[in-house]
Amino acid sequence: TINEFPLFAWLNGDLHAHMMGPPFLLLAATLCFAYYLTPAEAVWRRRGLLFGALPPLAGLLAVVNTWSFPSVAGLAVLTVLFAPAKARTLLPARVAEWLDTDDWRLDELLTLVIAGGSGAVVVLGGLVVSAPFWLVAASGRELALFPSRSGLGALVLVHGTFLLVFVPYLLRHALPRLRDGWRTAAMLAVVAVIALLSRAAAVLLFLPLIGVGWALLRWRDLPGGVGSRIGDRLRPGRTDATTSVSADGGDADGETDADDTANGGSTDSDGSLLPWPGFETVLLVAGAGLVLLVEFVYVKEQAGPGRMNTVFKTYAQVWALWAVAGGAALAHLVWQHRPGLGLSGGRWRPALQVFAALLIASTSVYGGLALTTHFASDSAYAQTDDPTLDATEFVDRVHPKEAAAIRWVDGLDGRPTITTAPGSYVWDGERNGGSSAPSSLTGVPTVLGWHHEIGYRGQKAYDRRAEDLRTIYTGDPNESAALLDDYDVRYVYVGPAERATYGSALEGITVSAVPGVTIEKQWDAVTIYEVDQSEL
């Protein structure tokens, strides 16, 4: 599988959906965080965040990066499930009061149903907002089950850095709450058996993270100390009326006192209040769920063999979520030392500080080396003496023969359809590699873009358009005219890539012989023909 991390993706510079989506996914996580921090009595604010702000954002993500669309709903479900404010307070007061129960099993089931329903509302709202996209988008993809799974070594190699942070973070919250080590060991043994039977090493690594994170956020004690109190939440002072927490999981006012214990906060053997994990644990559980999901389900498509593309696009989201969660968790390990936390105080304080320093230094090596040319090179792409945020400025330096023509296309009114040679991965027009630059750099639609469209549209659709383009450029004038009319083409672009692709034909490029096709603009290396649709 492909496993790109964000810095590599941005340095590589492919403006793929998996690069454009993370900022919007993190915006969705931010809205969920705002919901998480909102007091229970602010019902309409929470409803507005959940049902007013998230659905339009989900709809936007459906268009920008469809892979992230269901993830927004997943974040919404987990946030409603784990937030300090009880899920049922989202319902009308009379309904919430009627559904109130002392049976923790029914309460947990009700919470799951409301959280799932909230996610469904986000999905439906997103579908409505992005309806035009779904109505015109073509897809021959389908879900498939039980792909070849990742080995333990590969998973540790890709996710090991995050595990180095998340495991001690969860342990320091979990250890003080353990009441029965044997029961805990038995549960871990069950996880190991499941991993063995499912032949999925990911189950062994990530199911405990999900289970411990879930238990810390939902239940008062971990296995062994649960008893009849399993339905009680850890957070002190948690009522349907008032609940507010800070970013790191503490009270909004930063205070803890004896009243917290009286209100239901867990205590250790010394009577010290047990701190609870923050919203970063929600992101941790979300990312672990995504990693586990792609071990069993994948999208069957033509963008790569098996689950290659599914892992690629899903892990890009995991990186975004876990990078934020990992930063908060690492800061917690270094700075938060108090009674009630495991791995805290004494020799743990300097040990964790050294650990954090080594971790940051070791994981920063790639960035330091990869960015060297961005600050010490005067190549055609990296101009350190005159830096710019304009990602298209390189065209004038690297492709001066086509720069003026591309600027002309960029200045066209509206969105007229043009034709270009099918693009390849690298822009090298004289070697049959144009990358559809007149279209990709301007946003003007072209009949056929680069070959990666095969993964989106299918091999047959791509081949059909490729053959139609060859006919437009080199075929019989009458056949060319019919295709220009079918695709509503306004301009035909003939540059280095088009000459390399079609110029070797028997009669070369013959589009100029089509009635209604005339030269609109010409440069030394590029000729742009205008198509008069009324004369075709």
Model regions and ranges:
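Membrane-helix boundary/interfacial segments in multi-pass membrane proteins
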Residues: 7-14, 18, 136-157, 199-204, ...
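Membrane-interface alpha helices of multi-pass inner-membrane proteins
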Residues: 9-10, 51-64, 189-196
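Membrane-interface transmembrane helices that cradle and orient dolichyl/undecaprenyl
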Residues: 28-46, 78-86
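Membrane-interfacial loop-to-transmembrane alpha-helix junctions, especially the N-terminal start
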Residues: 42-51, 109-123, 175-188, 270-289, ...
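Membrane-interface helix-loop junctions at the exits of transmembrane helices
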Residues: 64-69, 124-140, 193-206, 215-225, ...
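Hydrophobic transmembrane alpha-helices of multi-pass, membrane-embedded glycosylation machinery
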Residues: 73-82, 208-214, 330-334
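Signature aromatic-anchored transmembrane alpha helix within multi-pass, membrane-resident enzymes
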Residues: 112-127, 187-188, 260, 334-369
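Extracytoplasmic
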Residues: 345-354, 358, 362-536
